[in-house]
């Protein structure tokens, strides 16, 4: 197996995988940002309206949020989305929230490596 196949085999609990295999892999880390986050929040809201309240995450220490696409906010919707992300991180105990203008700012796709939140072999 090549390195990608080994990583996916580990994450899916299989001894091996091959091209064209369909696997369900457990992720090591989850990243949200100010573009993807609002869509995630809509799913949580939809579930709540269906009577399925999600009161906790699988592991808040494996989730991190970055504000880097629509900051500083140029319109009301972008600003509201940042507030919603902040509320989400507070409500679900996510400590790794890289807020624009708080000395924690960075590009989400490089923060993962610069802050050692994702390590070689991780699926995220």
Identify the function of each model-found stretch.
Residues 1-124:
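Fe-S-dependent hydro-lyases/dehydratases of central metabolism
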């Amino acid at each position: 197996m090549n390195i990608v196949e080994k990583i996916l085999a580990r994450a899916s609990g299989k001894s091996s995988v091959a091209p064209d295999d369909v696997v369900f892999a457990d992720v090591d880390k989850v990243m949200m940002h100010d573009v993807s986050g609002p869509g995630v929040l809509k799913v949580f809201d939809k579930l709540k309206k269906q009577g399925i309240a999600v009161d906790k995450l699988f592991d808040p220490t494996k989730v991190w949020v970055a504000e880097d696409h629509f900051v500083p906010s140029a319109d009301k919707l972008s600003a509201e989305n940042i507030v919603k992300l902040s509320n989400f991180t507070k409500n679900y105990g996510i400590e790794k929230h890289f807020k624009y203008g708080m000395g924690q700012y960075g590009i989400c796709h490089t923060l993962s490596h610069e802050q050692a939140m994702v390590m070689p072999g991780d699926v995220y």
